[in-house]
């Protein structure tokens, strides 16, 4: 399921963000596995609180990175939604 700019993403209830001190990398943990996150992926997921829309998340990141990121954020979250790690609140 593709998310839109008005979707309000939240993590699947059994998934959680963590920092792997061995790898020195952020990870998304879920019962069946782990997704290794780069700093940008971690920044996106930290903003997925079930209150902010995809557009609001992108706006925060655009200010932080001085770049138009809406399409990239939407694509990234849609891919995680397809894997059922993110849902539209």
Which ranges hold each PLM region?
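Acidic, low-complexity/disordered tracts enriched in E/D and polar residues
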Residues: 1-46, 74
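Long, charge-rich, low-complexity alpha-helical segments
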Residues: 33-89
């Amino acid at each position: 399921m593709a998310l839109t700019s008005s979707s309000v993403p939240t993590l699947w209830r059994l998934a959680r963000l963590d920092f792997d001190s061995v790898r020195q990398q952020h990870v998304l943990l879920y019962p069946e596995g782990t997704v290794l996150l780069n700093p940008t992926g971690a920044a996106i997921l930290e903003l997925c609180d079930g209150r902010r829309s995809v557009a609001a998340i992108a706006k925060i990141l655009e200010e932080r990175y001085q770049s138009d990121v809406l399409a990239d954020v939407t694509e990234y979250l849609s891919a995680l939604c397809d894997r059922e790690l993110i849902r539209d609140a």
